A protein has these predicted regions:
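Short small-residue beta-strand/loop micro-motif enriched in glycine and branched aliphatics
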Residues: 103-108, 363-367
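Conserved AMP-binding loop of ANL adenylate-forming enzymes
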Residues: 128-172
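Conserved adenylation A10 loop of the ANL superfamily
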Residues: 94-107, 455
Length: 497
């Protein structure tokens, strides 16, 4: 019965979504007009003359691009209980995240925007079922490794992790078969929580597991160690792994080993600020994401190269080009206006609009003018691990600026699952692929400004130790792939000494 309902619902959703997929520019134009209309009587709208904005060009003249720190004065008013500041009324929630220079970020979630988060997660699964004809996951247990659903309250507004907020909106179709229990989900200590999740899930008919790869990996490894079996032996009905927030490629080899068999994966692009995309095709090795244009989000784009050099020229979706690295800018029904979320994307298709997430604008390495981005180091690692039959657990890249008796270079801190037989060959593979991808890096190597990169092995569990030491173990927290300073590198050296 559940399968029949899902099939009918999936076909209905497909027809609804096809309307905006077939008319993307029209939908974005209508979204723009709708957002401006709703924002006219807000404090932000009055300060930026929304009443007289009739076109996108006028909007760009009146509303600058802002990041969280620049929008903070408005958000603080909302946090303090004031209404009609960024969006009519007050938000339902604040998604609390870490990562700013002045403490936690509070991202508003309104009654309009929460619906788009939930609908997108639902649509991603329904699309998967319809495209693959695999409805078996519906007839089993589903595990979502996430933050605590216990929410704090401030000025009458609940706040917590986005994944914890979303736990209050699980569709009835999935609620009965959901794991872990509410009590276990509320455990704050991550390692204790994983142990409790294992107790609740081993022996159950698990068919869907979702979560950030690094933390699901920890969960899987503890099960394999405890049971002495592969994941597919422990969970023979498991047929779908859903992830978001990071590239799966660096984890693919180790997950294949843990699974012990091939398993379907579903890539998504959720964030506290909005749900931006999900994988809509399931050919081999295909993980491009359909950009969602029906979520009350108006998208703008700035070439990442321009942004890093101080030029903020932005365009709407009708002017984007393929294979250009863009910084993603959003205006939403949560009251974020031309907001820089920090993610960079590339378009792989414009009919329909599909993207890959190429990295974080703040997670780049350009200590020597090389402009290296996350996508490049992940691609280099993918190539090097395949060429050298290596599996890795985690890695990050940092600059070595003033070494003694040698040229500056990049240091790659790598936690290996299995070590290369020839470390110098592995290192050479990484360096060659970076040279192939990044012309600036090649010029610096050829010009003897930089020497070839160096690989530094991190002891087993080293990255988890690092994340624990900075209070970011578990949940939606991720290790940055690269940085322009040595904070992570030096900390890794200290705790792994």
């Amino acid at each position: 019965m559940k399968t029949i309902i899902a099939i009918l619902y999936a076909h209905l959703v497909k027809r609804q979504n096809q309307k905006w997929i077939d008319n993307p520019i029209k939908w974005q134009t209508n979204t723009f007009k709708k957002l401006i209309k709703n924002g006219i009587k807000t404090e932000f709208g009055k300060n930026h003359d929304f009443e007289n904005i009739k076109s996108y060009d006028q909007y760009k003249e009146k509303v600058p691009v802002r990041d969280y720190e620049e929008l903070r004065p408005y958000i603080e008013k909302v946090v303090n209980g004031e209404k009609d500041i960024l969006w009519p009324g007050k938000p339902l929630y604040f998604a609390k995240t870490s990562g700013t220079t002045s403490g936690a970020k509070y991202i508003p979630i309104t009654k309009e925007s929460i619906k788009t988060h939930i609908r997108s997660a639902r649509d991603a699964l329904l699309n998967y079922f319809l495209k693959t004809k695999n409805f078996k996951p519906l007839n089993g247990k589903h595990m979502f490794l996430q933050g605590s659903p216990e929410l704090d309250k401030k000025q009458g507004i609940y706040h917590g992790r986005l994944s914890g907020i979303s736990a209050h909106y699980v569709p009835k179709l999935f609620l009965r078969n959901r794991k872990p229990s509410w009590t276990t989900n509320c455990i704050e200590d991550w390692e204790e929580k994983v142990e409790a999740v294992i107790q609740e899930t081993v022996g159950e008919k698990m068919t869907i597991i979702a979560g950030i790869p690094s933390w699901v990996q920890m969960y899987f490894e503890k099960i394999v160690l405890k049971e002495g079996k592969t994941i597919s032996q422990v969970f023979p009905d498991l047929s779908l792994y859903v992830y978001g927030g990071v590239s799966y490629e660096p984890y693919r080899q180790i997950f294949d080993k843990l699974f012990g068999k091939s398993i379907d994966t579903l890539a998504t692009f959720p964030a506290s600020e909005g749900f931006f995309g999900y994988q809509d095709q399931f050919n081999k090795d295909y993980t491009d994401l359909l950009l969602l244009l029906n979520n009350d989000i108006f998208y703008e784009f700035i070439k990442a190269e321009d942004f890093l050099s101080g030029k903020y020229d932005r365009i709407s979706i009708k002017d984007v080009e393929l294979d250009v690295n863009y910084l993603l800018i959003i205006s939403t029904s949560a009251g974020l206006w031309s907001y820089n979320i920090g993610d960079t994307i590339k378009f792989t298709s414009i009919d329909p609009y599909r993207i890959i997430v190429s990295g974080r604008i703040k997670h780049f390495l350009s200590a020597f003018g090389e402009h290296v981005i996350s996508e490049e180091v992940e691609k280099a690692m993918e190539v090097a691990t395949k060429l050298n039959n290596v599996a890795i657990r985690e890695f990050t890249v940092a600059p070595k600026i003033n070494p003694i008796d040698m040229l500056p270079h990049h240091e790659w801190y790598v936690e290996f699952e299995n070590f290369p037989e020839d470390m110098s060959a592995f290192t050479k593979s990484l360096d060659n692929e970076m040279i192939n991808q990044n012309i600036y890096y090649k010029d610096l190597i050829d010009g003897k400004i930089l020497k070839s990169l160096e690989v530094i092995s991190v002891e087993r569990g080293g990255f988890n130790n690092y994340m624990k030491s900075v209070g970011r173990l578990g949940g939606q927290n991720k290790v940055p792939r690269l940085s322009n300073d040595r904070k992570i590198a030096d900390k890794l050296k200290t705790i792994n000494a």
